[in-house]
Every structure is written in C-alpha cells, then in structure tokens.
C-alpha cells in the first residue's frame, strides 16, 4: 500500500469538507493507495506525461476536488484540496 504525503494545507482543507464528501474522497484516496481508481477520479489533461489525478465530489453545498499524483512508487502526493466556486 502506498503512503499518503500531504502537500501544504491539502489535509486541513479536506477536513473542512462536509463529512460525506470527506468519506467519499477518503475512499478514493484509499483506492489510489491500493493501485485502483475511484469512479469519480480522472486524469487531468494538459500536463504532459505527469500522472495527476483529480477526484470530484458534489453535494448540496458545492463541488469539491482533490488533486494527487501517482508518479512515485511508494507515495501518493495529495497536492491540493479545494471547493470549486
């Protein structure tokens, strides 16, 4: 299982999301750790050969996103967590 490495305030930002959104994104990150991909996760285009993945979750209060990379063999770097305005 790959370890998560949180960049900047990404972990704190995720903790501010609604509980249901946190749970679903947490499940998506777990799947990534296991080498799989959540059905709401998709690669971001336009970044060359970088393997950057975005998980999107919606609820009544908006759309929430977490961006991570799976480039490293032992780690998943969670780059950013934010609410789309």
Residue ranges of each PLM-predicted region?
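Basic, Lys/Arg-enriched alpha-helical interface segments
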Residues: 1-63, 72-76, 85
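Conserved catalytic cores of phosphodiester-cleaving nucleases, focusing on short active-site segments
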Residues: 79
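Short beta-to-alpha linker loops that shape the active-site pocket of alpha/beta-hydrolase fold enzymes
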Residues: 82
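Portal/gating segments that form or line small-molecule/metal binding sites
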Residues: 66
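Catalytic DNA-binding helix-loop module of base-excision-repair DNA glycosylases/AP lyases
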Residues: 69
